[in-house]
Curated annotation (Swiss-Prot):
Name of this chain's protein: Large ribosomal subunit protein eL19
Its biological purpose: Binds to the 23S rRNA.
Molecular function (Gene Ontology), one example: structural constituent of ribosome
Key words of the record: Ribonucleoprotein, Ribosomal protein, RNA-binding, rRNA-binding
Pfam family, one: Ribosomal_L19e
InterPro entries with a match to the protein in the record: 60S_ribosomal_eL19_sf, Ribosomal_eL19, Ribosomal_eL19_arc, Ribosomal_eL19_CS, Ribosomal_eL19_dom, Ribosomal_eL19_dom1
GO cellular component term, pick one: cytosolic large ribosomal subunit
Stored Gene3D superfamilies: 1.10.1200.240, 1.10.1650.10
GO annotation terms (biological process): translation
Organism field: Pyrococcus furiosus (strain ATCC 43587 / DSM 3638 / JCM 8422 / Vc1)
Family of this protein: Belongs to the eukaryotic ribosomal protein eL19 family.
Length: 150
């Protein structure tokens, strides 16, 4: 049996694709084997004996399912994590999250008149300095120093 290597190469050049994407009709292999010029190959392409196969894509089916599961909070356990804690949530992001929560709490306390303006400002600056890791520590400090008004 003929390998049709030359015909395949010429067809690939004409159809502007790789040699692996060339389909040759198995019924008309003898016609293709006798084709030696570019014109012969072009004629066979026109007749539909030689065709260009479609590109094989990469299926997103499994990826979509996995993404849906991740949206539900699955696949996020310690065994699935790669990289440090800071790689998953940056230090700055974490700081912003913490400081916003503290400042919101301070504003709430000031609005409820549980702390005065002077105390608010002092606590605001201490929060900015990183004295409080979370709201719990803020409240511990307030109780320790008797700064909360009843």
């Amino acid at each position: 049996m003929n390998t049709l290597k030359m015909q395949r190469r010429i067809a690939a050049e004409i159809l502007k694709c790789g040699e692996n994407r060339i389909w040759i009709d198995p019924e008309r292999i003898d016609d293709v084997a006798s084709a030696i010029t570019r014109e012969d190959i072009k004629r066979l392409i026109k007749e539909g004996v030689i065709k260009k196969k479609p590109i094989k894509g990469q299926s997103r089916y499994r990826a979509k399912i996995r993404h849906e599961q991740k949206k539900k909070g699955r696949h996020r356990g310690p065994g699935s994590r790669k990289g440090k804690k800071t790689a998953r949530m940056g230090k700055k992001e974490l700081w912003i999250k913490t400081i916003r929560a503290l400042r919101k709490e301070l504003r709430k306390l000031k609005a409820q008149k549980k702390i005065d303006r002077k105390t608010y400002r002092m606590l605001y600056i201490r929060a900015k300095g990183g004295q409080f890791k979370n709201k719990h520590q803020l409240y511990l400090f307030l109780e320790e120093h008797g700064l909360l008004k009843k």
